[in-house]
Amino acid sequence: MKQLLLLTSLAVCFSCSDDNNLIVQEYIPTDDASFVGKAVGNFSKEEWFPGGELGTSDDVSPSSYEAPTPATDNQGLTQNFKNGETFFERNFNISTPPFSGLGPAWVRQSCIACHPGYGHGKRQTIYRANDYGNGYLLVVYHPTAGTDALGNSYAANSYVTEVTGMPQTKAAEPFLPPIDESGIHISWPEAAEGALPFTFPDGETYSLIYPVVTIDPEAFHTSPVPTNYECRIESTIGIYGSGLLDAITEDDLREQYRAAAPYCELNPAMWDKAANDFAASAWYTLADGTKAVKRFTYALTRASLQDGAGANAIWNITNVTRSDRHKLYTTDAWARAMSETPSVIDAILADPTSPYRGDGTREGAAQAVKTLLSPTTDQTNNLFHNFAEEMKDRDYYDFMVWHRGLAVPRARNLQSEEVQRGKQLFEEMGCATCHRPSWTTGEDNYWAPENIKAQGALPKYPRQVIYPYTDMLQHRLFMLNDIRTGWCRTTPLWGRGLSLQNTGADDRLHDCRARNVIEAIMWHGYSRESDAFSTTQKFYNLPKADRDAVVAFINAI
């Protein structure tokens, strides 16, 4: 359902939320229509259209993150886009098609629950998967190398194997969730002063907060439970414009790495400094064996959008199977624990319709549970119960039309002298080194799996000049309780100034620790080791009017 007015959209989107601290800002339309598409000050006419001619929407309303690209409409894919959108917005359930197949364990019931208003998740103080806007994924990992309870060795910063990489906190009866939410604790202490004081030279002050997340050992319903673990949280980001980033060529990505390598340390997992080329681990193997360079997610774990975070999430967030995903997103440790839980077996044996009964004995039911909940079992072809595929290929295709077809909202207020001053400072201070303003897409001969190609074409964005404000590389900021590994891909800035009116929140950075743009900038300089410390120091020393101009620029692009 499209949002026409901010207050209406908030009434709809937040009706099931317990968040009483939501900041609602009245939607005030921009007064720049007569300037759009014209060169103004230090902005070219093209900069009004950050997604290029084929990827920009003129919609800057409180539903602007939801608009289709002109390419989607030009290719006659509007109806597919609309159908695909429903699979993003609707709650999946256990048994009623076409949104059936939820579980047996899941992270969220819908995509939009994590991407409120199609944007960035909101900061949370309590972890509840059912709270709208909670875009957090738990990251449970080993801070140091060691050996697990089964004798398997693991490396430092590796994910625990007892729960999934995106851990689940919900499960269908009679199963218990892999992690009990009541055992997850989030606190937000204020940071002590870092490398730069919390008072600007002109007297204005700011503060920084950061998340501390713990999970009680008894909250894990796995066998064995993890040991030597820590937890972080990572929030969802805006998904509009992803198709345009997918259209950047690998040659251009390589040139960006080569241009940056002499001036900063790059993640050795992505860049082989000695060879001056991509590292072996920078390449991702797609379903048909094609090798492609990783470019998506904070951790750079995915290469093609059609096998990227969204294509994966419609399966593993909900555990809804499809023709190319016949297995569950689970762990053997959870499957084993459920097979050993008396209440689970009791409930299964008491239900004559349960697919987990096996031969009807306790031992048979336990074996069926252990097998059917395993991540290695083909759900459609096994010894115990052959489930049907839960998402049709046509619906998955429409979902990917929608995903690749989301437009970037046009820029706003570029005629403003304050915004123009902000752009000048942004470039002079060196912000544009990592937040690279512009790329030009290639021919966009995108990769797609067979179940997509068999249905039709996806939106394409050939030869578009785009302005995402990201170098597509990972950098390190050395923040308190930093992201796992410390390496984080530069988040695109395009459209972020519309976050508050689209989502009801303006939280920034990978875990929403920054409550506004100023805090996001100052976290870049919290540590002298940060890749962005010198740039942040320059911002810190600006007079207030110039700091405000930089913020105005970031909110305009």
Where are these regions (language model features)?
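Residue-level detector of alpha-helix boundary/anchor positions
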Residues: 9-10, 98
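C-terminal motif of bacterial Sec signal peptides marking the signal peptidase cleavage site
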Residues: 12-15
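Long, low-complexity intrinsically disordered regions enriched in Ser/Thr, Asp/Glu, Pro/Gly
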Residues: 17-19
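N-terminal cofactor/phosphate-binding cores enriched in small/glycine residues
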Residues: 85
